[in-house]
UniProtKB/Swiss-Prot annotation:
GO terms for biological process: spermatogenesis. PROSITE patterns: CNMP_BINDING_1, CNMP_BINDING_3. Keywords: cAMP, cAMP-binding, Cytoplasm, Nucleotide-binding. GO terms for cellular component: cytosol. A nucleoside 3',5'-cyclic phosphate binds at residues 116-239. SUPFAM superfamilies: cAMP-binding domain-like. This is Cyclic nucleotide-binding domain-containing protein 2. It is found in: Cytoplasm, Cytosol. CDD domains: CAP_ED. Essential for male fertility. Plays an important role in spermatogenesis and regulates sperm motility by controlling the development of the flagellar bending of sperm. The gene is CNBD2. One of its GO terms (molecular function) is cAMP binding.
Length: 576
């Protein structure tokens, strides 16, 4: 009987405990659901996924905490990459007189991504933002037809258009290399200003978005006065140049009508190869640099410099490199250091190593650096340091063999173009055999330039012998790649020496620097600092995986470096 009562009590307790655990689980789930509801309260009735609800994109809900109604517009969060923003479209649907100053400024800020719009002066930018309207056209739509009078001019916000000489624009889809205008370009401005007839046809190659300025709005808001001010500025700039001193005002105005002002910020790329550019550029303000992407591996000077410095990778003292003992001195030193044990086999070892190093070439080559000057001993007291063996992959180039890791490139400054100088005419009248065909990059240092197409300029100077004589004097002889490579190596040696000297003279920071948990692995090429460290050429490290790596089509053909850390003597030995 007693056993039965104990068993019944245990079953009852077990049942009650199970009910208690179930109740606790339900309470925890309720609390978790409540937390989720509070966290996602702002996303209730979120209608952004289904396109059917885009007809009513604005919804609202009552916020108990704030005691107010919160309104949410889903159209503000729709991502349409590259398209003109819906808010700006709504502003441009208004008449110019109905647009507020804040709306005009908002449109002006959005249009700063367009290069052609940004080149206008700030007052003219605001006037254009006030009168613009938005248009979107599909593929094969003819925007401007040849022979018609110009009533509008256009800014391309998205898409591509082609320029053709036929009336319907069909040749653009048959030509393998049509003349194209992309986002940021504009066309039709001068035709609107002078009410001239269109000389070409513009057709859409894909769905394209335009910002259009009509002729009526153009003159009603006095945009012609601002455009005339820019034209007067270009005229005065050309008139001050000695090159156009013999031209009449009428002929100079023809040049002004075909020229355009463009502004570039510091470090902005102007042209990847201005020698192949179809434009002539007059620097009206600021300055720019001519750069050359130099393939260092193709230079004999760079190859000799690499091999000279790789011989120092063993880290021997300075005296052992500067002085080489004569055979008699080496024999006397051997007798002193090797007494009573003598091993004559090591006397010719350094010379044999030099001879072995010159025999044969292969893709993978071992660079044997010189060991210590002490001979190889049979006894345990005096031991010579073994020669260090460096194994690296080799490539065969025109000057000779070069370690694969050392085949890099560098951007070298060739020339600085100042205000008043001209680019694009330095080889205009040279024979084809004497022209410099190397690609030269033009980078802005914060400048303003005036562009004009070469064919238009050549038409204006046709049969003008005096002008041609002046242009022949503008020829610029840029240095050869070999000279630029030698200058780069000299500058690099000085920069590395200066850094070594600063590290020696400047006291290190007393406070302990923060060290990350994951130790940084030394690599021969550091893409962040753009430095090639040849001292680590023989050290094997595991490859590091960066968070982001640009596609190869966006990268230059060579690994770009700004400095090369080569094996070198210690700075203390040089100053001793």
């Amino acid at each position: 009987m007693r056993r039965h009562m104990v068993t019944y009590a245990w079953q009852l307790l077990k049942k009650e405990l199970g009910l208690y655990q179930l109740a606790m689980d339900i309470i925890i789930m309720i609390r978790v659901c409540k937390m989720f509801r509070q966290g996602l309260r702002g996303f209730r009735e979120y209608q952004i996924i289904e396109t059917a609800h885009w007809k009513h994109p604005i919804f609202s809900f009552w916020d108990k905490k704030m005691q107010s109604r919160v309104t949410f517009d889903t159209m503000d969060f729709i991502a349409e990459e590259g398209h003109f923003p819906p808010k700006a479209i709504q502003i441009m649907q208004k008449k110019p007189s109905w647009r507020t100053e804040d709306e005009i400024q908002a449109v002006c800020n959005i249009l700063q991504v367009l290069d052609s719009y940004r080149n206008y002066a700030e007052p003219l930018q605001l006037l254009l933002a006030k009168v613009m309207r938005f248009e979107r056209f599909g593929r094969r739509r003819v925007i401007i037809k040849k022979g018609q009078k110009g009533n509008s001019f256009y800014f391309i916000y998205l898409g591509t258009v082609a320029i053709t000489k036929d009336e319907d624009g069909s040749s653009a889809f048959l030509d393998p290399h049509p003349k194209l205008l992309h986002k940021g370009s504009c066309f039709g401005e001068m035709d609107v200003l002078h009410a001239s007839v269109r000389r070409s046809t513009i057709v859409c190659m894909e769905e394209t978005e335009f910002l259009v300025v009509d002729r009526e709005d153009f003159f009603a808001n006095k945009l012609d006065q601002e455009v005339q001010k820019d034209a007067q500025y270009r005229f005065e700039f050309f008139r001050k140049m000695e090159l156009f001193a013999s031209w009449s005002d009428e002929k100079l105005w023809q040049l002004v009508a075909m020229a355009k002002i463009e502004r570039f910020s510091y470090g902005q790329l102007i042209s990847k190869d201005f020698g192949e550019s179809p434009f002539i550029m007059f620097i009206s303000k600021g300055s720019c640099e001519v750069l050359r992407l130099l393939d260092l591996g193709a230079s004999p000077s760079y190859r000799r410099w690499i091999w000279q410095h790789l011989e120092l990778i063993d880290g021997r003292p300075l005296k052992t490199h500067l002085s080489e003992y004569s055979p008699m001195e080496r024999f006397k030193e051997f007798q002193i250091k090797s007494y009573p044990l003598q091993d004559f086999s090591s006397l010719k070892l350094p010379h044999l190593k030099k001879a072995w190093g010159l025999q044969g070439t292969s893709f993978s080559r071992k660079i044997r650096t010189s060991g210590d000057t002490l001979p190889k001993m049979l006894g345990p007291k005096i031991q010579s340091r073994p020669a260090q063996s460096i194994k690296c992959a080799m490539i065969n180039i025109k000057p000779g063999e070069l370690p694969k890791e050392a085949a890099v490139g560098a951007y070298v400054k060739v020339h600085t173009v100042e205000q008043g100088e001209i680019l694009g005419l330095h080889q205009a009248f040279l024979p084809e055999g004497e022209c410099d065909t190397r690609p030269l990059i033009l980078m802005s240092l914060g400048n303003e330039l005036i562009r004009i197409r070469k064919e238009i300029f050549y038409e204006l100077i046709d049969n003008d012998d005096e002008m041609i004589k002046k242009l022949l004097k503008l020829n610029i002889a840029f240095p050869s790649d070999e000279d630029m490579c030698q200058k780069f190596l000299q500058q690099n040696s000085w920069n590395i020496f200066r850094k070594d000297l600063l590290q020696l003279l400047v006291e290190p920071c007393q406070s302990q620097l923060f060290t990350p948990n994951r130790p940084k692995k030394r690599e021969i090429y550091n893409p962040k600092s753009v430095v090639l460290d040849l001292c680590s050429i023989n050290k094997t490290t595991k490859p590091r995986y960066p968070i982001f790596m640009a596609p190869q089509k966006y990268l230059p053909p060579l690994r770009i470096v700004q400095a090369i850390k080569a094996p070198r003597y210690k700075i203390r030995e040089l100053l001793a």
